[in-house]
């Protein structure tokens, strides 16, 4: 059996939960949920009671699919107004025969000494590099020999009050938060590879009411910007122009419109309800023109924000978020950014939708964090893990992924 992790992303429109199992360095999705949310705006808690009720409902659905109750989560938190700084830490190596995960942890803890956390709380501490005895530089020093281990670390923080409201609401919902990371961190780990780990790039996540732009240097976030525009603005445009209900506007956007109007069919029609006595047909071309105009504006604003955040050469741009699933979205991205940009492509069975990028990636981040420190953490008890197994005397199954395959439904 592999290590099992649960990630949760509290969005304005929906709560996403993804449960993964790591087996032989591969991550398999055991359960995924996208459930309507209330009391949450841009990842922040506005009404803890309403938010808790929504979270409980999502947790019940995820637990039902998993077959055991979820009691521990890794939580995505919004990077809006986050602060980042580079700090230094060091430690004497415990055993000269080889650096251990404990030495790594001690060096990272030392880097936090003397930092002012009066108003802000630590979210992540991402090591840039480790130096052994002032000479050897590496990203993972475990097993190497030396007497002094030093590290350069990017620490990120967010305002305490906002973070504590998120943690308190999750606790009220019946789960323990074992770790936190920014949604942008989850997005990066969802697409992380050796190539991106050596480059400077940007990730654009188009959310419900805001768009987040994150700059990464060799796999570590160094800058962040947030725009007050998102997917809901597309809905509002459709509602205004065609006098459609908000729910119908969203449905047209997701299931009818093209992101690039050139690919729309002028003969394809969609019937909307104006009032109880009046219905109206709208053409795909007309709806797509409205959608394209707003999405193009969001992409242009994001491009300008990238320039404002850094003057470094951007070697890759990844666009994610639910809006990036629009038909033809990749063609619009190519027009605005060129070949340096592409749409996030999550191919894992069970989460083939970009709305899951943050909470899927955060489980990979947590596992990576543990591996560097040579630690393990059980989010599900041994008894619960055993209860998840489906006994089949005729077929040998290597992972829980196979055993809970039947829990998947319309999330693919």
Region locations from a protein language model:
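Nucleotide/phosphate-binding catalytic cleft detector across ATP-hydrolyzing
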Residues: 1-14, 18-73, 77-202, 245-246, ...
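Short, surface-exposed connector motifs at secondary-structure boundaries
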Residues: 148-150, 217-221, 309-316
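Glycine-rich phosphate-binding loops at beta-strand->alpha-helix junctions
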Residues: 78, 158, 258-260, 314-333
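Residue-level signature of catalytic and energy-coupling elements of molecular machines
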Residues: 17, 75, 170, 205, ...
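Acidic, glycine-rich loop-and-beta core segments that form the ion-binding/anion-interacting portion
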Residues: 194-261, 265
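ATP-binding/phosphotransfer module of carbohydrate and carboxylate kinases, centering on a glycine-rich
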Residues: 303-317, 326-342, 372
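Phosphate/pyrophosphate-binding loops at sites that engage ATP/ADP/AMP, CoA/4′-phosphopantetheine
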Residues: 58-71, 299, 303-316
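Glycine-rich phosphate-binding/hydrolytic loop that grips phosphoryl groups
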Residues: 345-389
